[in-house]
From Swiss-Prot:
Protein name as catalogued: Ribosome maturation factor RimM
One Pfam family in the UniProt entry: PRC
Subunit structure and binding partners: Binds ribosomal protein uS19.
Alphabetical list of Gene3D superfamilies matching this protein: PRC-barrel domain, RimM
Gene this protein is translated from: rimM
Compartments where found: Cytoplasm
Annotated domain remarks: The PRC barrel domain binds ribosomal protein uS19.
Organism, as annotated: Lactococcus lactis subsp. cremoris (strain SK11)
């Protein structure tokens, strides 16, 4: 099977007409959840279920309300709560130099002054900037905003991120 990459999680239903709320995990949410987009549905055990074609999608707060073709009632979609929607690798957008996908960053080692401090486990999108969650041994997770003074260098090929932890970020 080809490579697929997560673009969102179905977190709930919306209304009675078969719409779902999708929590996006992509910087290309407008493209992924727009009319005509094709997504692959995976269950909570990461088993492929089926391809879905977006009939309509709209942003509502921090969710996308999406209607897929062929689903007309809440009963058709209720069972998909907690399932993940992904895109096939060949459907990924081409990126500019210095840009990267979440899956290329998650799992990367994080260094400050050439000292390993942990690994990126998750990327959050709380607002203006992404926040990278760094898992550390024996310490609580470190939340790093993805801003130039903090993230100094990202080497996707080496799975390495160099950072400068500003005062107050590690309290």
């Amino acid at each position: 099977m080809e490579n697929f990459y997560k673009v969102g999680t179905i977190v709930n239903t919306q209304g009675l007409q078969g719409e779902v709320r999708v929590l996006p995990s992509t910087d290309f949410a407008n493209e992924r959840f727009s009319k005509g987009a094709v997504l692959a549905l995976f269950d909570d055990k990461d088993n492929y279920i089926q391809d879905l074609k977006v009939k309509s999608g709209r942003l509502q707060k921090n969710f996308y309300v999406v209607k897929f073709e062929g689903f007309y009632h809440i009963n058709d979609v209720e069972k998909y709560k907690g399932y993940v929607v992904k895109i096939a690798q060949e459907n990924q957008e081409e990126l500019n130099d210095g840009e990267f996908y979440y899956h290329e960053i998650i799992g990367s080692d994080v260094y400050e002054n050439d000292i390993l401090i942990g690994q990126i486990s998750e990327i959050l999108q709380p607002g203006a900037n992404d926040v990278w969650v760094v898992k550390r041994k024996g310490k609580r997770d470190l939340l790093l905003p993805y801003i130039p003074p903090v993230v100094l260098k990202v080497d996707v090929a080496q799975h390495r991120v160099d950072v400068d932890i500003m005062e107050g970020l590690d309290d």
